[in-house]
Amino acid sequence: MSNTKDNFNVADLTAALNAGDRADLVNVLKNKLHDLTGKHSNVTESLSPNVRKRVEALREIQTEHDELEAKFFEERAALEAKYQKLYQPLYTKRFEIVNGVVEVDGATTEAAAADKQEDKDAVEKGVPDFWLTAMKNNEVLAEEITERDEEALKFLRDIKWSRIDDPKGFKLDFFFETNPYFKNSVLTKTYHMIDEDEPILEKAIATEIEWYPGKCLTQKILKKKPKKGSKNAKPITKTEQCESFFNFFSPPQVPEDEEDIDEDAAEELQNLMEQDYDIGSTIRDKIIPHAVSWFTGEAAEDDYAELEDDEDEDDDEEDDEDEDEEEEDEEDDEDEEEDEDETKTKKKTSAVPKKSGRVPAAADGQSGERPPECKQQ
């Protein structure tokens, strides 16, 4: 990433994030803005008086635009909050069907017949593995879910999200049935944003998972046989971190002091935070509002179709560029051929032997090769 451009670079932003303090970040951004303002003022000073007046008029228009945009963000937030409340009854109905709290029309008879069976535990309630399947059908989340995670995620009953105001951001709540993996009934992930309207993440915090002994999915235990002749005959055990969806609840930690981290580590931290935000926003914006479409796979197909359309557009643009380049290459080749023809003509004209005491080429019209001293130098 280049640090030479006038816009905010990652190094400045990361330094602010590393400080872990909102006020410090604001100061960094203000200082950056001040520097940019100085550069821009130099630009306007170099303009002629008439052009400078026109630019000032444009800046006034931009100010009006920014004021309208601020109102847009304010009204959009209010509108989203309004509809978020309207969605809640629908989410409640979905929860009840998925978890077998209520039965839908047409399924009552089947359930009643199943109740007569001796093994009532075999009766399926609701929609088994609903959230697990929905998340696995999403490309971003599928990469995070391991086979070991799947059994635990089958106990996931619901996912909800809500806005938070102080500080700005949002939180995700994952509701679990009683399960053999951890004690928590709710796992929460909270994102604190620098600006709610711009996806600039300040930090993320999450519930600490209370794993039952030997059930932690984010760690694996390696056992090594003791060396031959060793007094200790017991195998050596070593615990290592491993890939798991539940690492989502151990977000990247931002150091309190920016001096505790070097530039490479800061960039890696920035990448991890962006990836973490991508997972959270995918759950908030895609999975929760369209869960059944992800469960059936329809949403994945739509996503794939959109991706193909984008790739086709990119391919068309690349093809156009390639055609333009080919035409330019052909024109260049034609120009080169014309230059070569002109050069050959000049060479033929200048190939007439000068008067000298040396013997010229054979005069009998035969195409014998000229002696070396007669060749055009």
UniProtKB/Swiss-Prot annotation:
Propeptide residues according to the Swiss-Prot or TrEMBL record: 375-377
Short sequence motif Nuclear export signal: positions: 47-62
Signal sequence segment: none
Domain of life: Eukaryota
Bias-annotated ranges (Acidic residues): 299-342
Regions annotated as coiled coil: 26-80
Motif (Nuclear localization signal): 223-228
Molecular function terms, GO-annotated: chromatin binding; histone binding
Nucleus among keywords: yes
Pfam families (alphabetical): NAP
Covalently lipidated residues, kind S-farnesyl cysteine: C374
Cysteines engaged in disulfide bonds, as pairs: none
A GO term from the CC aspect: nucleus
Renumbered residue ranges of the record's region Disordered: 298-377
Example GO BP: double-strand break repair via homologous recombination
Keyword vocabulary terms for this entry: Chaperone, Coiled coil, Cytoplasm, Lipoprotein, Methylation, Nucleus, Prenylation
Record keyword Nucleus present: yes
Residues annotated with Cysteine methyl ester modification: C374
PANTHER family: TESTIS-SPECIFIC Y-ENCODED PROTEIN
Recorded domain comment: The acidic domain is probably involved in the interaction with histones.
Summary of subunit composition and partner proteins: Binds preferentially histone H1 in vitro. Interacts with CYCB1;1.
Task of the protein: May modulate chromatin structure by regulation of nucleosome assembly/disassembly. Could function together with B-type cyclins in the regulation of microtubule dynamics.
Similarity comment: family membership: Belongs to the nucleosome assembly protein (NAP) family.
Protein name, entry field: Nucleosome assembly protein 1;2
Gene name for this UniProt entry: NAP1;2
